[in-house]
Amino acid sequence: MLVFYHKDNDGYCSAAVCNCYLVNGYDMPSNEDFIPYTHGETLDISSLREIREGERVYILDLAMDDVILELTMHCLSAGAVVVHIDHHKSGKDYIDALPDVTKAALDRYAKSTKFIQLFETALSACMLTYIYSSMNMDVEDPNSEQLHPMDVSFATTPDWTTIVINPGVKERKIVIPLAVRYCDDYDVWRWFHKDTEAFNLGFEAVPYRNNPCSKEWAALLNKERITVPPIVNAGYNIIGYRDAQYKRICEHGFEATICGVDCYVVNTPYGDSKLFGEKINEYPMCVMYRYSGKYKKYKLEFRSGDNGIDVSEVAKALGGGGHFHAAGCEIDNIDHVILHKESVTFME
């Protein structure tokens, strides 16, 4: 087994779910087989270990782009079964725009069940990974043929606590672990559960967060009555301080235009959509940016409110991608990208 996953809470949780529920005795992974990655970084595919015929390769919470497509084709060519689980709108747009010959190649692998995709923008990757693991969980006959995602329907209960596999037709109900619920709720910005924000803030300080093979992650998923409350309590202690810092940071923002879109911009290495307060609903989009000395690039993160624009389109125009209300990109220079409002003339 080889697992590539996004370096954020959703990706970490996806990888941990994979380790806890998708490992079998014939394909035991090591810590080195779990590879964190974020778009914009270098992924040296030539340096990967040899992939075995029939080995499963999971690509979790990583939108399809040039790098992920190269990784996918490399693994498929080596005889692996590639399972790509994602929920980013830009990834679907990328696949839709691929040349016909590339689409045909992926379709051939899909028809031979070598390339398995599970995609849904309304759910996070960790929720989709847990759903994928649940498709063959608790089946009466362990020797029965494994279910394929294309042949399985699924739903969640209205309270987002339970997965229903094949609803209405020999349906099975499987309870969703709290950590998966909270990471999902936060990542898609649904905010259904009252402890979602507290859990995700507290989770930022957890030392094993990016160690999906750890016994602590296994306990978080399987012994949640003991392991989840301390994280939630720590998060509630953080919220007040965080809000005060957000207010101070946001006061130093400025109005600008990016790709022709009016926006409110803040230069900060820290923050999420809540950084902008009510401004998120006062502008078509809000933007955070920072410079990474490590990668010598500017990181831009785009956010929009309920009535805002599709920021994934702005991100794509700058070489990035993401979701409708949350997206990002990395660029070499911002001089002609972020234009202060007083330096441009807007059409009425």
Report residues per predicted region:
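Long, charge-rich alpha-helical interaction segments
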Residues: 212-239
